[in-house]
């Protein structure tokens, strides 16, 4: 397919190469201006604003008093979803739970740093969190699974899902099934900027939360940015992105198959096949039409927009080292290492949020059922952030305990440093003044 973007990295100058790293980063300032009146309306009007915006923005008819999913709606969801899909949701949740249980930190640890002086950490769950589950380009029970399971494992006492309603005012049935199987029992029918505002400020129905996590549209991202001083907005998760890295040991047709996984998400996604093998690159190009013939019309449209645009296609490198360098510069959300010897490449990759190794580990498995979390940092934030985890739902407190035997030595050194930095009350608190109180 000659219209698929093909980038020979060795022929590009620094500016052209840098342009390949750009994502679909919307001008948030435009959206911030748009979300401000929405946020203010929700703050001032509560439920009435949510119902109005559901009608105006989501084209959904949510009845007054119907913003929270009822028990009857939860029960009905299991009848609406095919049994094999319910089974697969349960299978995925089981694996996600097994993986995330390993992340749960011990409640407290203490280290004796000096005889009689102890320092450590204590972990407690965040009191309340909101989980954002988008609906813009489809239904995503998988996002419900990925956000709900670690929150439940962390022991968060108040967990609520916010998700845009459908036109009849209901919530996607599979999303409700996933919520119930994961252990979440509160779901609110609101999405977009209005949902972020609702969980930040609270309404008559929606309880306020201390943190919100989950991917969303530019409207959601802008609302999170605007409300970041009110509610913790979690890791930056924007439009989906992936690199399929293939060496010369795999078929280019397989690389093309996996390239389309990310490209079909939407026209704002980013997806590259990176290889130093021209044979693999050409085979991938040749295989794309056959793969497109097996996709729905909408997903073909989405993936073609990505692969023929500025944020997708094939990147041919001069060597393996050049491939590694490009991948680390790009810092992808998802990285597949397509190779018969994937572990030989792993040590060269330092900047990727998710690394899936070998021809039997496509992104599809990780998105749904493998276990690692699929809510991941995008837009090169993999350089400083990691995947959503149990630790995103707990907070850490430092703990210190000093015995009477250890106190004098620590006090002596602390007193010297307090005096040097000019803090007289600090110094007094570990001086003979304290000794007199302790003795008396």
From Swiss-Prot:
Family matches, as Gene3D superfamilies: 1.20.5.1300, Nitrogenase molybdenum iron protein domain
Q: Which residues bind Zn(2+)?
A: 265, 426
Which cofactors does the annotated protein need, by name? Zn(2+)
What residues make up the catalytic site?
A: 333 (proton acceptor), 334 (proton acceptor)
CC annotations in GO: cytosol
Q: Looking at its record, which EC class is this enzyme?
A: oxidoreductase
The answer, when asked if Metal-binding is one of the entry's keywords, is: yes
GO BP annotations, alphabetical order:
L-histidine biosynthetic process
Identify the keywords attached in UniProt to this record, alphabetized.
Metal-binding, Oxidoreductase, Zinc
Q: Which GO terms describe its molecular function?
A: histidinol dehydrogenase activity; metal ion binding; NAD binding
User: Cofactor binding mode, per the note?
Assistant: Binds 1 zinc ion per subunit.
EC numbers: 1.1.-.-
What start and end residues bound the annotated signal peptide?
A: none
Please tell me whether the keyword Coiled coil is annotated for this protein.
no
Matching entries from InterPro entries are given as: Ald_DH/histidinol_DH, Histidinol_DH_CS, Histidinol_DH_monofunct, Hstdl_DH
Instruction: Give the record's family classification.
Output: Belongs to the histidinol dehydrogenase family.
NCBIfam families, A to Z: hisD (TIGR00069)
Supply the name of the protein.
Histidinol dehydrogenase homolog 2
Q: Which organism is it from?
A: Mesorhizobium japonicum (strain LMG 29417 / CECT 9101 / MAFF 303099) (Mesorhizobium loti (strain MAFF 303099))
């Amino acid at each position: 397919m000659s219209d698929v973007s093909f980038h020979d990295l060795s022929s590009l100058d620094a500016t052209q190469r840098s342009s390949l790293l750009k994502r679909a980063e919307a001008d948030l300032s435009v959206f911030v201006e748009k979300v401000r009146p929405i946020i203010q309306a929700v703050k001032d009007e509560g439920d009435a604003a949510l119902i109005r915006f559901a009608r105006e923005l989501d084209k959904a008819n949510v009845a007054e008093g119907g913003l929270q999913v009822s028990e009857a709606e939860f029960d009905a969801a299991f009848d609406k979803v095919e049994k094999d899909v319910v089974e697969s949701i349960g299978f995925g949740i089981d694996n996600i739970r097994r993986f995330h249980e390993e992340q749960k930190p011990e409640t407290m640890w203490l280290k004796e740093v000096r005889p009689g002086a102890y320092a450590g950490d204590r972990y407690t769950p965040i009191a309340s969190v909101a989980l954002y589950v988008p609906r813009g380009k489809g239904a995503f029970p998988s996002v419900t699974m990925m956000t709900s399971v670690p929150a439940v494992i962390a022991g968060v006492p108040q967990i609520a899902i916010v998700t845009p309603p459908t036109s009849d005012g209901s919530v996607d049935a599979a999303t409700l099934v996933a919520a119930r199987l994961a252990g979440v029992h509160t779901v609110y029918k609101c999405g977009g900027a209005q949902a972020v505002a609702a969980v930040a400020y609270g309404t008559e129905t929606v309880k306020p939360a201390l943190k919100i996590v989950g991917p969303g549209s530019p409207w959601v991202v802008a609302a999170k940015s605007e409300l970041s001083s009110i509610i913790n907005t979690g890791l930056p998760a924007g439009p989906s992105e992936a690199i399929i890295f293939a060496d010369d040991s795999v078929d280019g047709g397989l690389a093309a198959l996996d390239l389309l996984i990310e490209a079909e998400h939407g026209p704002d996604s980013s997806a590259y096949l990176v290889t130093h093998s021209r044979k693999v690159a050409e085979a991938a190009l040749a295989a794309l039409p056959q793969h497109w013939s097996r996709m729905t019309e909408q997903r073909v449209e989405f993936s073609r927009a990505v692969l023929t645009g500025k944020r997708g296609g094939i990147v041919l490198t001069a060597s393996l080292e050049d491939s590694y360098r490009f991948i680390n510069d790009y810092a992808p959300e998802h990285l597949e290492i397509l190779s018969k010897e994937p572990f030989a490449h792993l040590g060269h990759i330092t900047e990727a949020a998710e690394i899936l190794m070998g021809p039997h580990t496509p992104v599809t498995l990780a998105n749904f059922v493998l276990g690692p979390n699929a809510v991941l940092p995008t837009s090169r934030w993999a350089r400083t952030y990691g995947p959503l985890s149990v630790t995103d739902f707990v907070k850490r407190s430092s703990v210190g305990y000093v015995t009477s035997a250890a106190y004098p030595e620590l006090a002596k050194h602390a007193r010297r440093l307090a005096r040097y930095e000019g803090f007289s009350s600090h110094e007094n608190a570990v001086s003979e003044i304290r000794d007199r109180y302790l003795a008396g």
